[in-house]
Amino acid sequence: MGQKTLQGLVAAAALAASVANAQQPGTFTPEVHPTLPTWKCTTSGGCVQQDTSVVLDWNYRWFHTEDGSKSCITSSGVDRTLCPDEATCAKNCFVEGVNYTSSGVETSGSSLTLRQFFKGSDGAINSVSPRVYLLGGDGNYVVLKLLGQELSFDVDVSSLPCGENAALYLSEMDATGGRNEYNTGGAEYGSGYCDAQCPVQNWNNGTLNTGRVGSCCNEMDILEANSKAEAFTPHPCIGNSCDKSGCGFNAYARGYHNYWAPGGTLDTSRPFTMITRFVTDDGTTSGKLARIERVYVQDGKKVPSAAPGGDVITADGCTSAQPYGGLSGMGDALGRGMVLALSIWNDASGYMNWLDAGSNGPCSDTEGNPSNILANHPDAHVVLSNIRWGDIGSTVDTGDGDNNGGGPNPSSTTTATATTTSSGPAEPTQTHYGQCGGKGWTGPTRCETPYTCKYQNDWYSQCL
């Protein structure tokens, strides 16, 4: 992950101008955020382009004394001589701007490329593993309120081998990044990170973390993937108690071994569109989260889901999360609003086995060793583009091939022969809260008893 920055831990009387004066000519890098346009959509008004960019995480940056002669960070954390307390640290230390290209971050139009490695001018290849956040034109993080809404984007994971993790997720971070009198940079310098793993960082919500507490908050993993395996997972929290494991959906782990794969049902050797819907019990943006639904589009057509009835996470299938607020707690966080984080990383300790090895994917236990990745895949990167969010059915035209009725069973091919265990009607039915209609929809239009198909908008009807 990266490592430089510019403004930041400056006392209230030493705002932006003082930071500029503190820089020695030619030794500091200005903070220039790469532009990344996104779109907010409604069924009535279409999609409106947003003034957005990305910002590299605060923890990846260079913190230094005024003349740049000494780092304020040591191998064991913050230098306690320079930073015995927040006010003193703000007087002594500055946070530097970054070169985004050498940090593994590139944008072009609406596309964001995140690279695991960067080759320097000396020929050395370094692991940079960047993490960035979506930043608004006002200098604060964009807060996405996605309860009863959907988020879509295009993604290309074709260059990502076993052991890599391209992640796009939501974190309930403070919109300002914890901006305060001692941290005037805030979100503009990527501060305030938190997630359900409760990482212990040098700063907690923009404030010097003298107590070494974990930075805990609700986390919704929309995408954690390489070309071999993928999972989407809610991680709700109650206070500082979080569901760290989560109750995710991984097609391979559920037995659908040729779904997410190069040449698979969803061909990960080519780009595709991913849509995640946060469906409520009453179809509104103020209801209770009942279902997290995943939809894929490739070549202009909707890809059949891995599981019959759809690739979904429901409260009934997420009982392990109940002590942490459950799916409804995740919905509450989505309703309050969350910040979009995007990253690429690998795992030197566990080789990302939890994602793509054993019962979770086709990779061997050692294939994900970062040294193997560097030797064989130095160009490992992910491309994320065309990020849109808004009303369900408003962000992507799924085309005439729209079909949420589900694909074949894990290790079998579809046949016309009825199974001996079938007890339902011949006509396929949709489950509670599932989609049952909309433009281009060719999946089930009949709901299971006692539910009925209720119109929500031209693109989406729901079993309620």
Swiss-Prot record:
InterPro entries: CBD_sf, Cellulose-bd_dom_fun, ConA-like_dom_sf, Glyco_hydro_7, Glyco_hydro_7_sf. The active site is at residues 219, 224. Residues 1-22 form the signal peptide. GO terms for biological process: cellulose catabolic process. GO terms for molecular function: cellulase activity; cellulose binding. Optimum temperature is 60 degrees Celsius. It is an enzyme of class 3 (hydrolase). Keywords: Carbohydrate metabolism, Cellulose degradation, Disulfide bond, Glycoprotein, Glycosidase, Hydrolase, Polysaccharide degradation, Secreted, Signal. Disulfide bonds join 41-47, 83-89, 162-363, 194-217, 198-216, 237-242. The biological conversion of cellulose to glucose generally requires three types of hydrolytic enzymes: (1) Endoglucanases which cut internal beta-1,4-glucosidic bonds; (2) Exocellobiohydrolases that cut the disaccharide cellobiose from the non-reducing end of the cellulose polymer chain; (3) Beta-1,4-glucosidases which hydrolyze the cellobiose and other short cello-oligosaccharides to glucose. Belongs to the glycosyl hydrolase 7 (cellulase C) family. This is Endoglucanase 7a.
